[in-house]
Amino acid sequence: MSRGSGAGYDRHITIFSPEGRLFQVEYAFKAVKTAGITSIGVRGKDSVCVVTQKKVPDKLLDQSSVTHLFPITKYIGLVATGITADARSLVQQARNQAAEFRFTYGYEMPVDILAKWIADKSQVYTQHAYMRPLGVVAMVMGVDEENGPLLYKCDPAGHFYGHKATSAGMKEQEAVNFLEKKMKENPSFTFDETVQTAISALQSVLQEDFKATEIEVGVVRAENPEFRALTTEEIEEHLTAISERD
């Protein structure tokens, strides 16, 4: 076996290759892209919004049972991109942690603390031979009393960062390029602008116009900081506004 080939170093999650790579963690990132979904998050001046594709793989499936948007608490939402089964496991643990936090301290778990907890959990999965990383990138969103709207992204390696706008999944880089142009002037988006920027970014990278039933939109607003998913009718209104504007 040649030292630089990488062969043998992808068997165990805890062993670095001679080039300093952890192959199993890299494969987890590939699993996120292989799911074929793209998600986008945008932070406005008084709201935060995430948009993700809703692909129903089987015509016999009940559409309402397919989702990548998960409420963690009443005030925090999470959009999971990647392997859905891994996402549900992560969501359940995050809900338990948030409930425990509220019971212990008497107030809701802040968005940044939850994002850090998810990242810490993911990081531990990269250290032990008997575990595997989760094939999920999670975007966590909410409105903080002190810091306003917050959007965090947590990945399988255990990174977590706050973002003005971000993307995950198959067309991540294209979406980031689009968002960088949109956010260059550091705009203060209203609620409608925030939602429509996120939706139009997804339209741009997928190069297609989609129906309201083919995407999911999750929002949190400062005036009413509860996480909720927009209805099909509300999404339709935003799609109409985008097409009229363009």
Swiss-Prot record:
Alphabetized Gene3D superfamilies for the sequence: Glutamine Phosphoribosylpyrophosphate, subunit 1, domain 1
GO biological process: response to zinc ion; ubiquitin-dependent protein catabolic process
Pfam families (UniProt xref): Proteasome, Proteasome_A_N
UniProt-annotated location(s): Cytoplasm; Nucleus
Tissue specificity of this protein: Ubiquitous low levels, higher expression in siliques and flowers.
CDD domains from the UniProt entry: proteasome_alpha_type_6
GO CC terms in record: cytosol; nucleus; plant-type vacuole; plastid; proteasome complex; proteasome core complex, alpha-subunit complex
UniProt-recorded name of the protein: Proteasome subunit alpha type-6-A
Family designation: Belongs to the peptidase T1A family.
General function of this protein: The proteasome is a multicatalytic proteinase complex which is characterized by its ability to cleave peptides with Arg, Phe, Tyr, Leu, and Glu adjacent to the leaving group at neutral or slightly basic pH. The proteasome has an ATP-dependent proteolytic activity.
Subunit description: Component of the 20S core complex of the 26S proteasome. The 26S proteasome is composed of a core protease (CP), known as the 20S proteasome, capped at one or both ends by the 19S regulatory particle (RP/PA700). The 20S proteasome core is composed of 28 subunits that are arranged in four stacked rings, resulting in a barrel-shaped structure. The two end rings are each formed by seven alpha subunits, and the two central rings are each formed by seven beta subunits. The catalytic chamber with the active sites is on the inside of the barrel.
Main location: cytoplasm
Parts forming coiled coils: none
Keyword terms: Cytoplasm, Nucleus, Proteasome
Domain of life: Eukaryota
PANTHER family, per database record: PROTEASOME SUBUNIT ALPHA/BETA
